[in-house]
Amino acid sequence: NRIEFEHDLAADWARFQFLKQIWADTPKWATLAGNPLWTNALRMLGQFLLRQRVEAETAWDVALGVAGATNHELAVDILLDALCLDPDAERFLTERVDLLLGNEEKHFTRLLLRFHHIATMPSSAGLRLGTALDLYMEAQYRSIVFGRWPPVLRFLIAQRERLAGRVSSALAKVIETWLTKTPQTLGAGDRMPFRRELAEMALAMARTVQVEKGHGVMYLTREPLLYTAPLAGAADLPTEVGNWALELAGRREVDAEVKRRIAEVQVQKAKEHAERLKVDAEYKARHERRERIPASLGSFRERFPPWPLGASGKVDMDFRTACIKENGIQFLMRAQPALAGEVLLALTIEDQPEREYGSSRLEVDLGLEYTRDAYPTAFWKSPFFPFLQLAPETALASLLALVNFCTDRWAAEVMRERTGEVPGVTLQFADGSQKTFMGRRQVFGWPQSNDSMRNGSLFCSLDALERWLTQRLDSGEDISAEVEKLFREGNSAALVSVLVNVAKFRPSLLTGPLAALLTFPNLFQWDSARVEQIGYNFIALSWSRDGQAMFDFAR
């Protein structure tokens, strides 16, 4: 029968009283910023300084300048914390907007990073996954402290005109957190405050990135937050975010306004280039030398037209990373499943198909984009696994389209140097009909294959399909409709392989929807050989790089 507090208000108050005695001596109290016991008291001091005048400024502004000049970075952080935590934060922030946005937004960026930390708290407490993993979970998975957000968000939204055209990962992080950690509506059905406005700001920032990359700006570091933030607003701005995602996935013409902004910059650059050629002899000489360099012959390659399900051109790698690795596409899956399926296929299939003559490949080119994180094969690595749970019908149709596409590519490669029919698996159904699924033992082995790093996204997707079907069986659900769809619309022996594993998981299905599998006995011979080799599918070296917890989970 006791109450335990995780703070010590009395001690914080006592320390604050001491700090008020030395508030004018910034270097003296700044040395205490490295001691966590003094953090709360120093934040109170910062709020106290906001209300003390020193000639034309407040003591807070003076202290910030002194702390910055003397390289007391922790003291600067504490003062920024005080600004965010103050009951009158919106007014104080607005009064200092020029300070925050000046000097290349140094203080603005730091303020947003500090705010994100103090306005959130770990949501993974008590997992006990190991010291390093616990720290990672605490940093990555956080829930918001709701009361601390409204003043800062009102300030950001009020300054949206001044922030237009700026690109800030710190701002994107704040926006993404609010959009992902709050519901769309409140209990009475009213719209959650700030969601739509922040989604518009995130999308405007993403459009600026699109313009900058369109006229040649290169981002030297990966910035997935600039893409996941607008994706998180897919439910708030379904049309606008959907169109933007289709553009970046190469499935829609670039927005007319974006084209105009890119052309405007290009015209200005061309003018500057022409003027510099006239007045700068050294610049002109360098330009002429570059013009005389012959184009590289390179290897003999034939570029193919874009695949019907793929992108129409080069896809932004940061957008692909944000969607696949950072799970940003899940926002589209919830808001617009059909559009998400189209984008997912475009990101999975290679965006610039080509064939290199004279080269020898150890694996068949299935027309997929190389995805480093899809090796070794595991169902949870595929975006189709959550897609199948969020929007089963749309996800299954998209997955079927992917498997059929890859199988068609396999057949085209195999039949390039042979004649006759494509080898396959012929099944007989209860109504007397027959159907041949392309591929023999190699294609049959795709769902549990680890022999290709380039085609890992396909293998993980097939593994995700198998896992989803077995989970539904475990939950007592009927999968007859899904099995019928796979038989009816699929063209690949890889899908038959998945269903063989499902039949092994629930043998009673062989007397019902999976009875057709018994009409091709070789399937079970191939499966027996696959089981004998299954021990080699665990790639210990690769899993060990992800840490002990992931190694044990994969094993």
Segment roles from a protein language model:
Residues 1, 14, 20-22, 433-441, ...:
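Active-site-adjacent bridging/hinge elements
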Residues 2-27, 41:
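Short capping/hinge segments at domain boundaries that bridge a core fold to an adjacent linker or tail
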Residues 9-10, 490-492:
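Short, flexible loop/turn elements at secondary-structure junctions
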Residues 13, 49-54, 514, 519-555:
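Extended charged low-complexity segments that act as oligomerization/scaffolding linkers
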Residues 22-411, 449, 453-473, 482-487, ...:
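Extended amphipathic alpha-helical scaffold segments
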Residues 407-427:
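Extended assembly/interaction regions that build large supramolecular complexes
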Residues 425-452, 462:
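Extended repeat-based interaction scaffolds and adjacent low-complexity, acidic/S/T/P-biased segments
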Residues 442, 446, 476-481:
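Repeat-mediated protein-protein interaction surfaces in helical alpha-solenoids
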